[in-house]
Swiss-Prot record:
GO molecular function: structural constituent of ribosome
Any single Pfam family the record assigns to this protein: Ribosomal_S2
CDD domains associated with the record: RPS2
Biological processes, Gene Ontology terms: translation
Protein name: Small ribosomal subunit protein uS2
């Protein structure tokens, strides 16, 4: 069975690129035509590229590696939480903090601090502290949680990144490239495909398009796990936060 059909791609608007004045010439091989000043992406090529990306993700997960889902733009935030949660992988859906990959040990220390604050709260230790100090600790906890919740249990670097809009996530892309971590990405007509190992030519702005393509990569993770029942329910708190 096909991973995705042309009909599904069309219905989700995956074929709509950016305005013709906002494009990267390196994306020319993936453009079918232009219509009313908008580039139309060649979905036959998109289907093939989805299959390549799907098989790659399935393979690395089958080998025991993880995938980090990255999408901080508003159109992607909710989908990233839901789909990463569905397949039991890690995610970043708020601002990418510089060094999340290249300075991972420092990031781990911040995660340890978050876990320490969570433990203090759970044990009721906040109740014996002055109100001002509790307010400061809660503010610190909420800030750490906002940015690090999706990678809280990530103990080592991921085997790959799945990125929605590599232009927006250029710092994440640069860090992954520096470390030799393969990148799978939804690449619109204004992006540089040369920076990406497995490109999925497609609309990175429409919520339905982002959801369809991201869900297929989550499916690849689940297939790589061969049905292993490890996927938690989507993080409802993060879902609410993404909707806010």
């Amino acid at each position: 069975m096909a991973i995705v059909t042309m009909k599904q791609l069309l219905e989700a608007g995956v074929h709509f690129g950016h305005q013709t004045r906002r494009w990267n010439p390196k994306m020319a091989p993936y453009i079918f035509t232009d219509r009313n000043g908008i580039y139309i992406i060649d979905l036959q090529k998109t289907v093939r590229k989805i299959e390549e990306a799907y098989n790659f993700i399935k393979q690395i997960v089958a080998e025991g590696q993880t995938v980090l889902f990255v999408g901080t733009k508003k159109q992607a935030q909710l989908t990233v939480v839901e789909e990463a949660g569905r397949c039991g992988m890690f995610y970043v859906n708020q601002r990418w903090l510089g060094g999340m990959l290249t300075n991972f040990q420092t990031i781990r220390r911040r995660i340890d601090r978050l876990k320490e604050l969570e433990k203090m709260e759970a044990e009721g230790r906040f109740e014996v502290l002055p109100k001002k100090e509790v307010a400061e600790l809660m503010h610190e906890k909420q800030r750490l949680e906002k940015y690090l919740k999706g990678i809280k249990d990530m103990t080592k670097l991921p085997g790959a990144l799945f990125v929605i809009d590599p232009r927006k996530e250029r710092i994440a892309v640069a860090e992954a490239r520096k470390l030799g971590i393969p990148i799978v990405a939804i690449v619109d007509t204004n992006c540089d495909p040369d920076e990406i190992d497995y490109i999925i030519p497609g609309n990175d702005d429409a919520i339905r398009a982002v959801r369809l393509l991201t869900s297929r990569m989550a499916d690849a993770v689940l297939e790589g796990r061969q049905g292993e029942q490890l996927a938690p329910e989507p993080d409802q708190e993060a879902v609410v936060e993404a909707e806010a």
